[in-house]
Structure formats: structure tokens, C-alpha cells
């Protein structure tokens, strides 16, 4: 094996750990307490042992502190058992302990013998325990060194030819952040106090600031904390109010124990989102925690030490799916006491905001029992807030700001009339602003400046998309803490230390965070039903409670009228099996109706087991499909499968053109109309050959380096048939098999879980139980689904494809002889040179196939030929010309040449703002770059760029259109930058970002055309580097020129770049670029919103 095979993966390890060495190099640096060096390798060792030692990599951040002994104090199995029991007892994250769980042993027996295995060995522990090579390593290095290796280091083992897998240590994927790139890009220009580095190729570079190290950040935090404590002690000695000071300091430490976010002073100057260093190992994301209740402190992550304010978020998911009235509003809640529930008072609200949160209302013990003096002084103003809340007429404000349009009685019974009756986010903001003005006393704002700044954040928050979020740092930006006298311990003017300002800032951030996350979000949930909609990306619609009630009632009645569900009587509900999981029904608005979504929600053991069994069923069906692809018929899962089909057709069609007939058919209500009997038959037929087969289920993580997107990670779950060999169960054999199948190369893999106790008959039994026992609750009634499958299940698409694949194998078996059939779940597309075959296929589907529940929707049927009798045979369908761009699943196919382009008409009337989820990151520039690069990789698909499938003219047009859309996304991202960051503050960085995207697009285009000469430095080939760069220049100039004030510092650089490229390209190639950039071909983009 050459060293070059491992260079990429070793670079990954070196970027994650301070020290990365082979086991041989690690052993050479060990000096025992007895005075001699470790001798791991000896001349008499076998070649396999030497290769093993040189193929094990030891990674750590610190050196071995204690001087080890070379003695053997216990056997290797005893040492392994001691390490595993210690890890589980101390609850430490370590790959070695994955799969090792304590059996049903009493606690006394566990503590009695730590040198005995108290759980089943699996995964890494089983691999090490059964390895004679590791026993030899332990014998030569001693117990102390082996314990240090397995308990404190991260050890990786080579899996030839180019991967490694982790066997112990904290999982490596914890050190890879997906929110920020690994580069040091910042939004501000470089400072003279910092060193700079070069990025890009040759002279195309930009000097940007390096991020600080993690150690420096932690050291500065400790220093600030020590200084704060010293100054606090000084003030305590000097203060006359010694008792009140002591209380305040007690609250300070109590709040630290409650993991409240501490806001840095730099946040107030607007630098928090710009100058934070990109840590190698970021704090855990708050999204890992379950969503809190309404009004709860969702910005508290529970992490310790507390996260900085730039990493504490309030999410728009908090106000989705509410609309339950004001009785659940946080200020209308009552506190449970020994004497019974009572209304909130000022003191209760202070505790709700600054201390316990919502658990306080449920009777949780008060901490501290007496409010400190500073907080005690706040009670009157918060009491006035409650009084103003009880006097506020929310309903009249709601009717005035968000009125309901009066409809006729006939229109009130139609979904098409009620669906558009949603309130614009701006109207919702006006309602919230009016309520905030009426309820919050002026004293709490401190100044009109603070009030207007908070209103601005509320307006942006309500206009956000479904997965957007705002950080506490962004919420506190430009807020003047000194304007708020209620934060002070004493109302007298005078000097105070920086720690006092930091403390006041933290208190104010807590209040404003509660005001947004508790009051605003709670008020929106109480008065509106906020939901996403089909075809509107992540945009949120706000429906008045009474409008949504009518919509939901109409949609449910129509759903029941289809005969797919039967109501259960109370006796039938009581007789349901104990483990029955009851689903909830939710509706999502569409253009012309409502889509029902069935979801199983809950955290109990039955729900978790149900989800696990569904995932197992899906994985087994996927494994079965991999071994027998014919089960899926003509199913395509995305653009990659479509490209494979068209690549087999297009070359022959281009060489010898012939008339092609296209038929597009969409099935109406595909999921809801599948007959249970037929579905049981299909799944039984699919799983019957493997009912006695044993399946292995492996969960693993993968880390790899992308030259343009930095370090990336992904999590996967794979199910395979077990052949009983060691290669199918060991992680090393699994990684080697992945490399043989070209699924993984130059990557670090971490096994998370492994199981081999699944059988096909178990999956078939669960599927039958799931199908017959699908129970749905809506309101106070319970129903059983007697037809169709739930739309919200992860396995629904696969079940639908298997059923339709079975139908195709029965009815359309002969199509492959003359035509090509593709189906994306329930969207059929037939391409055939035989007109009779096209008419026969269309006739069968239009007539319906009741045994499979297939009923075609005539409004979505499209053909490019007339019927047999001048169009009279198919009167209700859409007929296109023989030569046209044929629409199917967001694509446009040329019916003559089979060129493919994307259908951008679906963007008409939509805002690109809602197609992107940027979030509020402390390194927004890095997040923007990573997001745009990942989108570019997805959009530059071979389906549009492959010159064997598409003509050169079509490929150029596809490139220009996707780059033009990328420029629109770039503008949307710039508009969304937090802390008023602009391109003018660092135009070099944004120019470099555009340049990097052009380089990445060039690489993706060449990757899509492997084997073809597209262009080089001698201006040869069909698609030159300079041509793609010029397309980027033209697209970005076209979009950014419409916003000259924003990009006044960037546009001259793009014009200079454009002129240079035009000089490099010849007349012929320049004409090709201008042909693709013709404004007449960009009509689809005119209706797009940004």
C-alpha cells in the first residue's frame, strides 16, 4: 500500500486532533517508570503484526501525563471489562462502549466486581476482545498504556485501501460542525494584528482573518470569569448592602447552574456574529433537545458551561400548529399551589421569566426561595405588566388588524374559497405590535429606541420560513442596556465595574428572550394556526382560528366521505390491543384542497418501538429490492435514476431521429387508494423468499473531506443479508465491502449500532399488524384506516412503489420491448416510438385499475399526440404539439432530441427567501458559503450537464439558468446576513465566494462528462473553464446590477473579470456563451420573487 492512499484520511484526522500517530510511533515515545523504552515491534514479529501496528492510528489532544508502568496488573479481558464498566458507570461517550449495556444485574453486584463483563460484547469491544493482535500489544505495552489508549485516546484502524474506522474514543463526528465550514472565512476584512493566509488558485486569492484556537477562547473566558469574581468580591466589601449583594451573587451562581445563556459585552457592539472563532469541536446543537412547551425557555439548551448568546436560538417552529385559544396563553396560566390553582402575580412572573420557567407553574420548588433584592425590586413593574395584560382586549385588536373576510353561505362550504383566507405576516406583526404596546410597560422597554429595535426583530421573525431561527445575540443587537433603570440594584447614578454591565445585559437578554419566545410566540399560537403549505417551500401561512376550524372540518368530512376510514365505537376503542399506537391527523393546505398527513407523535416506549419497527421494515424491503430490482418495476427515485434511463436512449435518438410519443399520467390519491388486500399480497410475495433469512442492521457515521465544501459528515443505516461470515459482521469487513462497491473512499467511519436478530417473517408480521391496526384520532373520535396507507410514514413511498411495480409487471410487461417507462412514485411517463402502444397505455390508466387502486387524474394527463379519432378519444386531457418541451416532475424533455432542462415555471410567484434556510449563525459568512456550495453541487446534476444526453446548446443554457438562479440565491443570502453585514464591508470575500462557485461548477461539469475533452489552457474542447466563468459573470451581473447600492463595491470587479474573460475567449466560443445568456430565454425568471 502506498502512502498516497491514506494521505486524505490522515489529513482529516490531523484536522480533528492535535496529535495523530501510528501505534508504532506512539509506542516509540513511551518511557516506562522502570526506565526503559517500550519495544512494541521485535525482529521476530510476523508481517501481519507489523502491518497491524502500522495501520493503527492513535489520536489525542494531550500527551500521556502519568508515567506508565510496564507491568501486567491484570489480564487483557479483565482490563477491557474494567474500562467498559467504568465508561458505562461514568456515562462517558466512547465508541468502545457502543452496544455494551448492563444486563439485569443488581447495583451491588456491579460494584462488587469491575473486572467481569456485566453486559454483552458487541461492535468494537467484541472486535478487540477477540483479537490476538491486541492481546500482544497489551502484553508488550503493559496495562497502564493500554488503558490510556482505550479509555482516553481516539484509536482508528486501517480498512484497506483508503479508509479507517474508529474503535475507541469520543465519536469523531462530534468534532465536525455542519453549521460552519472548516475554513477561516469571516465577513470583515483582515485586521493588521492578525496573520493572513491565501485561498484559491494561483493569484486568485483573498487575505482573510484566521480564526482563533479553541484553547485561546477558553483561556480568555476563564480570565474574564476570574476578573468578574474578583471585582464582585471588592464591591461586596465596599458595599453597605452586604446582605443584598450576597443574595445577588447567590442568584448569579444559581443561574449558572440552570445553564442560562451569558451574553458577551461584544454582542452589544454588533461583533458577535462576525468575529467568533470557528471551533474544531462546537457545542452541541440545541435542536437535539425536545421542543419545549409554549412559553418555555427554548433558548436554554441545557449545556454546561452555558452556550454563548450567538449559539442560543429561538425557532419559528415554536408557533406552528397552534390555534387553540387564549386559555393556554402563558400569562393566563394558573400556578398550582397547595391551596389550589391561583392566578399569576408579579412575583410569579419574575420567577417564570428569570428562574424556573414553566415548571414553576406546575408547583416546582422555588430556587432561590427568596427573591434577591434586585429581582424583588422588579416585582411591581411585572405586576403592572400582568394588570395591563388582563385589561387588554386581544380579540378586538385581532379583529381590527387581521379581519376575516365575510363570505356567502355557499362559499363557506367550499375549500377553494377558504384556503386563500390566511393573514399576511405583516398583518400578524401589526397585531403583535399593538398587543406589546398595550401590555408591556414603558419602564421595561427603557427607551423608544429599545422598543423599536425589538419590534424590528419581531417583524423579521414572523416573516421567517419554517426552519428559521434567531439568536439571542441578534435579538440583543443595538439594545441599550443602560436605558433600563429597572435592571439596577440601586437607582442612583455612579460608576460600576464591567461585571455589573454584563450582569444587567444577561438579565435584559432573559427578559427579551422570554418576551419573544414566551409572549409573542404564545400569542401567535393562541390566535392563529400557523402551517406550511404544499408548493410554497418553507413559507408559513397564518390562519385565524375560526377560519382554520372551518377548513379542517370541511377537509376531514371530504376525507371521510372517500370511504377510506371507519369510525370506531367506544367499545371498539376499549378493545384495541394494549400496544396499539394511535396516530394524529393533520392537514396541509394545497392550491385546490387539503393534504392529510398522518403522524405518530409521542415519546413513550410503544411509540419508540413502533418507529423502530417501521424503520426495520423499510430497511428490509430496501435490502430485498437491492437483490431483486424487478420488484420496483419502472420506479425511479430521483434525477440520478432518470439520467440512467435517458442516457441509454438519447445517443441512439440523436444519431437516428424518429418520432417519439410521450404519455404523462398522474394517479389521484395514490397513498389513500391502495387496497389492503393487494398490498398484503405484494409485500408477502416480496418477503416470502427471505422469511427465514437473518438481516444485519448497521448504523454508522461517515466523515470525508470535500475540496470545495470542507469537512463533511453523514449518518447512514444499512440492512443486508447475513451470510454468517466474519466479514459481514465485523466493521473492518463492512468498510472494505463498501469500498469495493465504490460507495466510500478516503473516509473515516464510526460504527454506532449493530444488530443481527431481524428476520423476514418478523417484518411481514409487523407489516400485517400495522396495516390492519392503523388507528387515527381526530378530535374526540377514533377511526380505523381500512384503505390506503398513511402519507406521513417513512415507508409509504416504498410500499406504493412496490404495489405499482407489481402492477407494471402484470399489465405492462411488454413495454420494454418497444418503449421506456419511468415512474416517480405515482407519476408515470411513457416514451415510445409506437403510437398504438402509447394509446393502449393511456387507455388502460384512464380507465383505472381498481385492483391496485389506480385512478388517473385527467387534469394532470399530458400527451404529445392526438387521439385515434382526431382527439375525440381523450377529450379531457392536455394535448401538446408533437415537437415540444414535455413537462414531467419538474423537468422539460425535448420530444425530438431528448434534451433535458429544468422547469423553472414552478418558481413563479414564489419567493426564493423561503427556499433557503440560513439560520442565525455566529459565522454567517461561512454558513452562506457552505449553503451555496451544497446547493450548487445538487443543482449541477449530470442529467442537465451530460453532453452524451444533451446537446451543447442545451447544456450551455442549463448552465446559465442554474447559475442565474444561484445568483438570485446569493442575493437572498446577502439580504439575510445578520448584524447589518453588507458586501461593502468585505467585497473581496464575496468576490472570492463567486470565484469559488465558478471553480466548483467547472469541476462538477467535468465530473459529469468523464472521458470527454471539455476544455484546457489551449482553448480546446467544447466547454472551456473561461466560458463557465463568463456565464457566472453574466448571470451575477444581471442579478446584482438591479441592486447597485448594495453591490457598488462588487460590480466593478465583476465587470473587470468579465472583460478579461471576453478577451480570452474566441469569437466562436463567445457567441456560444451569448447565445445561452440571451434574455429571451429567461422569461421564467421574471415571475420569480426575491
UniProtKB/Swiss-Prot annotation:
Cell compartment(s), UniProt: Nucleus; Chromosome, Telomere
Motif TFLY: positions: 316-321
Segments of skewed composition (Pro residues): 281-294
Tissue occurrence: Expressed at highest levels in gonads and brain, and at lower levels in heart, spleen, kidney, gill, muscle and skin. Detected in embryonic stem cell lines before and after differentiation. Isoform F is expressed in gonads, with higher levels in testis relative to ovary, but is not detected in other tissues. Isoform B is expressed predominantly in testis. Isoform C is up-regulated in embryonic stem cell lines after differentiation.
Residues annotated to bind Mg(2+): 666, 826-827
Positions of the UniProt region annotated as Interaction with RNA template: 371-376, 477-503
Domain Reverse transcriptase: 569-893
Enzyme class: transferase
InterPro entries: DNA/RNA_pol_sf (IPR043502), RT_dom (IPR000477), Telomerase_RBD (IPR021891), Telomerase_RT (IPR003545), TERT_C (IPR049139)
A Pfam family matched in the record: Telomerase_RBD
Biased composition (Basic residues): 190-204
One function term, GO molecular function aspect: metal ion binding
Coiled coil: none
One GO cellular component term: chromosome, telomeric region
Catalysis: reaction(s): DNA(n) + a 2'-deoxyribonucleoside 5'-triphosphate = DNA(n+1) + diphosphate
Region Disordered, residue ranges: 184-301
Major place of residence: nucleus
EC annotation from Swiss-Prot or TrEMBL: 2.7.7.49
Composition-biased stretches (Basic and acidic residues): 218-232, 252-262
Any GO BP: DNA strand elongation
Similarity comment: family membership: Belongs to the reverse transcriptase family. Telomerase subfamily.
PANTHER family to which the protein is assigned, alphabetical: TELOMERASE REVERSE TRANSCRIPTASE
Function, as annotated: Telomerase is a ribonucleoprotein enzyme essential for the replication of chromosome termini in most eukaryotes. It elongates telomeres. It is a reverse transcriptase that adds simple sequence repeats to chromosome ends by copying a template sequence within the RNA component of the enzyme.
Protein name: Telomerase reverse transcriptase
